[in-house]
């Protein structure tokens, strides 16, 4: 069974507007049917794009969903074979819903 491990940068109930200023993330494992198998919210000990990239790699994240992300981090993550869906605006639960169904695209504006 193919599984995806998603990381969504969050701020309150929204996708965080900036990757490099994220202090909280949602990590979810989704199976090939779109069912969420595990989900956890992680409060990061510090705000750091480098630390967040390290977490993405050590946790085996396959897809990052975020608002704005600097080109340097976007290129690094894609070079490491992580899919980055950026410029997403809206509630993070809607982003997860769309990602589960394979319908989330960069630049998506989601309504609550």
Predicted feature locations:
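Acidic/His-rich segments in extracytoplasmic proteins that coordinate ligands and/or metal ions
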Residues: 62-84
